[in-house]
Swiss-Prot record:
Keywords: Chloroplast, Plastid, Ribonucleoprotein, Ribosomal protein. One of its GO terms (biological process) is mitochondrial translation. One of its GO terms (cellular component) is chloroplast. This is Large ribosomal subunit protein uL16c. It is found in: Plastid, Chloroplast.
C-alpha cells in the first residue's frame, strides 16, 4: 500500500477541501483517464483496490499510472477511550482529491478495454468519477 517513506510531522490538521483541483487535472501520461467529480479523502487501500482492478482487467496489455498519492495521515483514538489526553495515533493515509483531479491514467490498450477497466476502478472509489480520453 502507498504511504510516504518519511514525513516532517507525524500528525496533521484535517483541513478543508475548497474549490476545484487546479493541478493534476489534465492527462499527462496515457490516453485514457479516470477523473474525480466530487471532493473526498481517498485512502491508500481504495487506491490500491482500484489499481488492482485495472491491472486485472487489462491483463498484460497497456500501462497504468496512478496520479494520486496518500500523503495525509489520519489519526484515530482507540474505541471506548475517554475524551482528552491528546490526539490519537496515525492509523492510515489518505490522498486529498478535489473535483477535476485525475485518479488513474491508462495507455497502450483499446478504448473499450480502458473504459471497462476504469468503470470497475470507479466502483471501488467513494466518489463519482468520469472516464475521459485525450483529445488530439
Amino acid at each position: 500500500m502507498l504511504s510516504p517513506k518519511r514525513t516532517r510531522f507525524r500528525k496533521q490538521h484535517r483541513g478543508r477541501m475548497k474549490g476545484k483541483s487546479c493541478r493534476g487535472n489534465r492527462i499527462c501520461f496515457g490516453r485514457y483517464a479516470l477523473q474525480a467529480l466530487e471532493p473526498a479523502w481517498i485512502t491508500a487501500r481504495q487506491i490500491e483496490a482500484g489499481r488492482r482492478a485495472i491491472t486485472r482487467y487489462a491483463r498484460r496489455g497497456g500501462k497504468i499510472w496512478v496520479r494520486i498519492f496518500p500523503d495525509k495521515p489520519v489519526t484515530l483514538r482507540p474505541t471506548e477511550t475517554r475524551m482528552g489526553s491528546g490526539k490519537g495515533s496515525p492509523e492510515y493515509w489518505v490522498a486529498i482529491v478535489k473535483p477535476g483531479r485525475i485518479l488513474y491514467e491508462m495507455g497502450g490498450v483499446s478504448e473499450t478495454i480502458a473504459r471497462a477497466a476504469m468503470e470497475i476502478a470507479a466502483s471501488k472509489m467513494p466518489i463519482r468519477s468520469q472516464f475521459i480520453r485525450l483529445e488530439i
